[in-house]
Structure formats: C-alpha cells, structure tokens
Regions:
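Short loop/turn motifs that initiate or flank beta-strands
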Residues: 73-75
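Transmembrane helix recognition focused on a "late"/terminal membrane span
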Residues: 1-51, 77-160
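A short amphipathic helical element positioned immediately N-terminal to and/or at the very start
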Residues: 52-65
Length: 160
C-alpha cells in the first residue's frame, strides 16, 4: 500500500463505518498518487463532534444541524420547546388547583403530566446519540464513494 493512501485510510478509520474500511483501503491501493492526493482535502464530519453536540445540545437539535438534517433539527427544537411549555402549563394548573379540595393530588397529577411532557422528547434525543453517530459515518462513506467514482474508481457501495 502506498504510504499516502495508508495515511489517508488511517485518517478516515473513525469517520466511516467499520465494515467499509477494508474495501476502501483496497480501492485506494488501486488509485494513482495524483488522484489520491486530492482525497486529502475531502471535508468529512467527525462523529465524535456529533455525539458531543447530542449530549449537551441534543434538545436543541444541534447534532442534527451538524449532520445536515435541518428539518429534523427544527423538529427537535419544536418538540423541546413544546415539552417545556407543557411542563410550565401543567405545573401552573396544578399549583392553582392545589387550593381546592383534593388539591394536592391534582397538583401531583399535573406535575407528573408536565414532567412526562418534558421528558418525552428526551427519548428521541437519547436515540439520536446512536442515529447521528452512525448517520455521520454513513454520510462520510457516501461522500468518499461519490468522490472516488468521480475519479473513475469502481463503486464501493456494492460492498456494503
């Protein structure tokens, strides 16, 4: 394997799906050096950045915006805001009903409904830790294969 092709494959190893690394290295071996050198400037996204964004700003859709899924990022923002609004509304309604007979039980029911509305979008946020991680790697591999096909290499997508 050419030294530059090997370095390039090692640079991409954590940015593409694991099952595609070997076929990609084999394809890079077949390319001439002048074509391989242009691959070094291919902008790939880092799945670790997507994960960190999901961990800290997942309710605001930052991981989806980073991945390029703008529509899903906006939907995550809307659901997160709705969860907060419903929590505040249920909490306020429960607090106002706490002065009536059986008020404490009404407050608890309203509080737990509000808490449920606040935590429901969290299920999607947690699932997105995995979906965005895998999706970024798939998108990177797709970008590499499209660029390789522009360079005249055989299509690697059939190896998956």
């Amino acid at each position: 394997m050419d030294n530059y092709a090997f370095m390039l494959a090692q640079q991409w190893i954590n940015k593409i799906p694991a099952e595609t690394a070997l076929p990609l290295q084999q394809q890079l071996d077949k390319l001439p050096n002048d074509k391989i050198s242009s691959l070094g400037f291919l902008p790939l996204k880092d799945p670790v950045i997507g994960l960190v964004l999901g961990l800290f700003l997942g309710h605001f859709g930052a991981d989806r915006f980073y991945k390029g899924d703008i529509g899903l990022g906006i939907l995550k923002i809307i659901l997160g805001v709705l969860g907060i609004v419903f929590f505040i509304v249920f909490f306020a309604v429960g607090a106002s009903m706490s002065n009536s007979i059986n008020g404490d039980s009404h407050f608890l029911v309203a509080f737990f409904l509000g808490l449920l509305a606040l935590l429901a979008p969290s299920i999607w946020v947690i699932a997105d830790w995995f979906f965005v991680w895998k999706g970024i790697k798939r998108d990177n591999f797709k970008k590499i294969t499209e660029y390789l096909s522009m360079l005249g290499a055989r299509d690697l997508r059939e190896t998956r």
